[in-house]
Amino acid sequence: FLLRVRKKLTGEESNSAKEADASTGENDMEVEKSASAVEKPSGEGGKGPEYEERLAKLKDILSGKTPTDLYLHFLYIHSKTDLLILKSIKDKLKPRNTVTHIATIMSHAIMNSGTTIDTFLRDNLQWLAKATNWSKFTATASIGVIHRGHYKESLKLLQPYLPSGNSNSNSPYQEGGALYALGLIHACDGGEQASFLQESIKSKNEIIQHGASLGLGLTAMATGDTAIFEELYEIIVSDNAVSGEAASIAAGLVMLGTGYEEGIENLIGYAHDTKHEKIIRGIAMAVGLIEYGREEA
């Protein structure tokens, strides 16, 4: 609802929004009335600097940017994380135990979720580099948990890890994790980084596709964007277990709570055709996400 109001305020109306408008009569009439009431305030036309300033603030509130900034500031100044506990855990771990290594990284991410405080990681880069393969993917993605909502600095923070045209680029696990982290930072922001992630899912590497798909699903969550859904569906039907599972979950996130019947039919139809259990599991989750909150429908 808030996303539709925001689009009305900014004058943007995508094809997917038009399709959604056609199928939701009464709700859209209410949205249009609400938007019209904001666009046409009483007084002298309502187009002065004060009006524009208020409209900009309203857009930020509806988009979630203002609440996110407030949460970010609050969590930063009220963080009570005890780094000595993490240091003690790290020092007592066996050097080659990958399970406890990644568990420590994840516990740090949870302890500092949304605070933007990543001092422990910066002070222990050599120890952090011991992560390999999917552990490296998870370790890089944990940056997104710590910096959740840090929109302005997201690309700058992740630049060293994101895919680039350089032949001596990072590990695909690190790049995939960085794309997932980007999605975690921009989760539910209406698709602000969608175009960047849409380019990334075109990669031929399944690990990068995995991370980019999850990131795209998070940043475009509940937008109901059929174009993004179709791009993700193309990855699903490519029948790669690693990228297909992530794309399935991402497709469900994009259509969260929309009850998109055509998408559900296509997903279930493909679930009967594929032999990959990961894709079947991902599709099952996607169907649940698409029908989220629609038990009465």
Predicted regions mapped to residue ranges:
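Alpha-solenoid helical-repeat scaffolds
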Residues: 3-13, 17-19, 23-297
